[in-house]
């Protein structure tokens, strides 16, 4: 299954969650798109509830189904912690997400584009793979020739707060993951237990 590249607001309204993180797409119409979206949400089956939770998280991180399910399998091989919490931590450590968490982009989609276009380095080396797994202590920075991009400067200026598991130097436009993200650090609107149940059927 390919990555969805259409309007994020349509998916946000269908799933009832802000994919951009700005919640603007839900501010006016917090129901599914279409003329009868307001009336279409009936009671979901157990499977439907699990599927929707999985889709919410997958679209939130902008991943294909194959990427998402492969990462889920990897999380299950980690011996410490729960499967769901480990999965969430691996998602958070994706390079595109870390660029977003550091405040170098206003959305994950924008962060993914910055990585794809070669504007980001890890420990001084350019990395253009959004799924790159960031390790604790690695330095994520904007390339020197990209530091004057308005898209980056505007994003940094708009930051209100950053997660406690990242450090950021605004002067150098660089930061790092200072520890593995704990479950309580992450999105409370996601019930990862439903996703574990979905894949374990």
Swiss-Prot record:
Entry keywords, A to Z: Ribonucleoprotein, Ribosomal protein, RNA-binding, rRNA-binding
UniProt KW Ribonucleoprotein keyword: yes
One term of GO molecular function: structural constituent of ribosome
GO biological process: ribosomal small subunit biogenesis; translation
Domain S4 RNA-binding: 93-156
PROSITE patterns attached to this UniProt entry: RIBOSOMAL_S4, S4
Keyword set includes rRNA-binding: yes
Pfam families: Ribosomal_S4, S4
Signal peptide start and end residues: none
UniProt-listed SMART domains: Ribosomal_S4, S4
GO terms under cellular component: small ribosomal subunit
Matches recorded under InterPro entries: Ribosomal_uS4 (IPR022801), Ribosomal_uS4_bac-type (IPR005709), Ribosomal_uS4_CS (IPR018079), Ribosomal_uS4_N (IPR001912), S4_RNA-bd (IPR002942), S4_RNA-bd_sf (IPR036986)
Annotated function: One of the primary rRNA binding proteins, it binds directly to 16S rRNA where it nucleates assembly of the body of the 30S subunit. With S5 and S12 plays an important role in translational accuracy.
SUBUNIT field: Part of the 30S ribosomal subunit. Contacts protein S5. The interaction surface between S4 and S5 is involved in control of translational fidelity.
Recorded family membership: Belongs to the universal ribosomal protein uS4 family.
Stated name of the protein: Small ribosomal subunit protein uS4
Source organism of the structure: Limosilactobacillus reuteri subsp. reuteri (strain JCM 1112) (Lactobacillus reuteri)
Gene from which this protein is expressed: rpsD
């Amino acid at each position: 299954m390919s990555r969805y590249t259409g309007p994020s607001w349509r998916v946000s309204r269908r799933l009832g969650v802000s994919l951009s993180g700005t919640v603007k797409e839900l501010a006016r119409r917090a129901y599914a798109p279409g003329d009868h979206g307001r009336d279409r949400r009936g009671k979901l089956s157990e499977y439907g509830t699990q599927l929707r939770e999985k889709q919410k998280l997958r679209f939130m991180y902008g991943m294909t189904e194959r990427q998402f399910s492969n990462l889920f399998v990897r999380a299950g091989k980690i011996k410490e912690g729960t499967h769901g919490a480990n999965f969430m931590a691996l998602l958070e450590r994706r390079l595109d997400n870390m660029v977003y968490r550091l405040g170098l982009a206003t959305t994950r989609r924008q962060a993914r584009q910055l990585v794809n276009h070669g504007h980001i380095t890890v420990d001084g080396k350019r990395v253009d793979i959004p799924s790159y797994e960031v390790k604790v202590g690695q330095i994520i920075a904007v390339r020197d020739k990209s530091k004057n991009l308005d898209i980056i400067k505007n994003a940094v200026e708009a930051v209100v707060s950053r997660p406690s598991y990242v450090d950021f130097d605004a002067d150098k436009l660089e930061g790092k993951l200072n520890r593995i993200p704990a479950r309580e650090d992450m999105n409370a609107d996601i019930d990862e237990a439903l996703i574990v149940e979905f894949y374990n059927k």
